[in-house]
UniProtKB/Swiss-Prot annotation:
Enzyme class: oxidoreductase
Protein name listed in UniProt: Acyl-lipid (9-3)-desaturase
Motif Histidine box-1: chain residues: 254-258
Function: Fatty acid desaturase able to introduce a delta(6)-double bond into delta(9)-unsaturated fatty-acid substrates. Can use both linoleic acid (18:2(9Z,12Z)) and alpha-linolenic acid (18:3(9Z,12Z,15Z)) as substrates. Required for the biosynthesis of arachidonic acid (20:4(5z,8Z,11Z,14Z)).
Encoding gene (name): DES6
Key words of the record: Fatty acid biosynthesis, Fatty acid metabolism, Heme, Iron, Lipid biosynthesis, Lipid metabolism, Membrane, Metal-binding, Oxidoreductase, Transmembrane, Transmembrane helix
Amino acid sequence: MVFAGGGLQQGSLEENIDVEHIASMSLFSDFFSYVSSTVGSWSVHSIQPLKRLTSKKRVSESAAVQCISAEVQRNSSTQGTAEALAESVVKPTRRRSSQWKKSTHPLSEVAVHNKPSDCWIVVKNKVYDVSNFADEHPGGSVISTYFGRDGTDVFSSFHAASTWKILQDFYIGDVERVEPTPELLKDFREMRALFLREQLFKSSKLYYVMKLLTNVAIFAASIAIICWSKTISAVLASACMMALCFQQCGWLSHDFLHNQVFETRWLNEVVGYVIGNAVLGFSTGWWKEKHNLHHAAPNECDQTYQPIDEDIDTLPLIAWSKDILATVENKTFLRILQYQHLFFMGLLFFARGSWLFWSWRYTSTAVLSPVDRLLEKGTVLFHYFWFVGTACYLLPGWKPLVWMAVTELMSGMLLGFVFVLSHNGMEVYNSSKEFVSAQIVSTRDIKGNIFNDWFTGGLNRQIEHHLFPTMPRHNLNKIAPRVEVFCKKHGLVYEDVSIATGTCKVLKALKEVAEAAAEQHATTS
C-alpha cells in the first residue's frame, strides 16, 4: 500500500510495483542534449537512429505511457488519500471497448505487433495497443524501442502517476500465460520498493537551492574578473569560469528535466527550460528526445550494428566497437579511424559547438506546434543575446571573440569529458536486453567523493542513475553499495573506478578499435 507521503507499507511486491509512483515519482521528461550524450551528435548520421526505428515525426516533450495493474483495485487495505489516488489512477478516462475486456494474448502474438503502425506493449502483464498513440507520444520515438515487448520496468522507471491513467485507454487484454518473473527482475523490483519506503526518491530542496546559489556565484565570479581587468589573462580566467558555470548548470538542468527536484512536472519543466535553453543555449526538446532514447537503449545497435543510441553514432570520426567498425567501407574513413585514440580528447573541445548546431537545427526543422517552436527558438535566441551582449559590452576590441571562443571550447571539454566516462568503452550490443541488464552492462561508475560528486554533477553514479533516473543525485551514493551487491548476485559487472582509470579504459577501447581499423584498411587497399 502507498501513503501520500510516498512510503510503502505492508502489501505484496506486485502491489508495491503497481502503485509505487503514485506518491513518490515524477514524470520522466529528461533534459536537453549534453548530459549523458557524448560526441554522438557530430556524425551526419546522428539523426538516423530515430528514422530507422519509426520514421515518425518528432515531438518536443517527454511524457509517455504507463499503466497500473487491475489488482490495485482489489487492494482493500488501502486507505485515506492513497486509496482515492489509487482509484483515480486505475479508473479509465474513456470507456474501453467491451470486446477487449476479457481477451488474452500470448507473448508470441504481442511480438508480432512491433511496427509503428501496429504496435503493442506489455506493462505488468497487461497488453496495450498504442498504434494510434505512438505518433503522438510526447517522449518521441523512444517508445518504439519497446514495440512488441514487455516494457514494465522501463515504464516504471520513467513515468509519473499521472501517466498510469493514460494507458487504460489502450488496454486490450492480458498476457495469456504469465511466465514466472526472472530472479533478476524480481530482486530489482524489490530493491526499488525498498528505496521508495526509505523516501530516497524525494529531493532535498535545500540541496538544490545551494546548487543554484553555487552556480550563480561561479557566474558572478566570471563577470567580476573581466569587470576588474581587461588583460588577456583575465579574459582567459573569466572564460574558464564561465565554462565551469555552463558545465554545472548543465548538471542542474539535467536534474530538473529528469523530474528529480519537484513533485510537479511543470515546475521541473519551467526551470529546465530556463537553465537549458536560456542560460546554455541548448534545445530542451531536442535533448529530451535524444536522451530518452539513450536511457531506453544505452549503447544498443540494430542487427546490422547501426547505432540506435545516438550517443554512439559517431562515425566517421569515432567507432566505439569492432562491430560498428565492420560497417565502414570507405577507405578514407578507415584511415581516419586508425588514429581515433590520438585525437579523441581534442574533439571534446568542439562538442558544445556540435550540440548548439543540432539544437538550432531542431528548433528550425522539427515538427513542432507554433507555440513550442516559439518557446524553443525564443529561449535559445535569448541565450545568444545575453552571451554575445555581455562579451561585447564588457570587453574591448577583439577580446569578446577570445572570451566567447574559450568559453565554448572549455565548456565542451568539461561536459564531454564526463559523458565519455559513463558509457564509452563499455559493452556495445545488438540484441534486445531487458531493461536492468541493458543499463548495467553499458554503464560505468566513477567512485564517489566530494570532488567527483561535484565535478560530474552526480553522474559519476551513472549505473544508479540509469536504473533510477528520477532519484535525486544526492541519494545516489546512498544506494550504490546495495546496487553493487545486486549486480554481484546476478553475475553483472559493476564497474566502479577512478577518473584516471576510467579515462584509460576509454582510450584503451578506442585504441583497440583503431588497430582493427588499420587492419581493415590494409585488407581493403
